[in-house]
């Protein structure tokens, strides 16, 4: 019988592939979740493209981003992003770091990313901008040191997304399903904001709309619906989807044929 850890590995591997299948992750980037029974650990794949991640690739790490059981395979160099956020934010149970092409223009230009349609409201009221130079001067732009991860976590603060200068974005969620929802719709919101900006003035959602729409979007129903949709799209892409068999409805009693009474035919 699968344990909670086995189930977590399965769903985390699927989340990696789902986000990649939707075009947000490519060869780089990573998705993690907090350990299902030990909040002082988190789960993360060995270093490989998210689209390739399988349950057996998932390993346990401490919040200092040290692997519990050493392996020969390479590990992600930026895993400190995840460990430091889990340290700083007990309410966060899943994290995604990505370099989506729709997000990068905001990381390059410094333009503020704002929710511009209802499903983008899960961005939250503020998306902070982190510049590694403020604390560390010129760097490789890779977040590989614990102090760099801690600086990024401070920049995230109580928010759910932080943009990283000339690098990408880091997204947080209270659950893995919420994280997938927020990550995918953040990228789509960014694309729409850029497209709308080309037409003229962009009017984002106001604070009340952002709060109300964000809360509505993250109800169990919408989150589960989106997860199922992206999950089936992944299965189709991987060639593992089997369409459900259509059920043949029984005829209602009123539609049954009533036998004609026996007797002589009437003469016309």
Predicted feature locations:
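Glycine-rich flexible loops
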Residues: 1-268
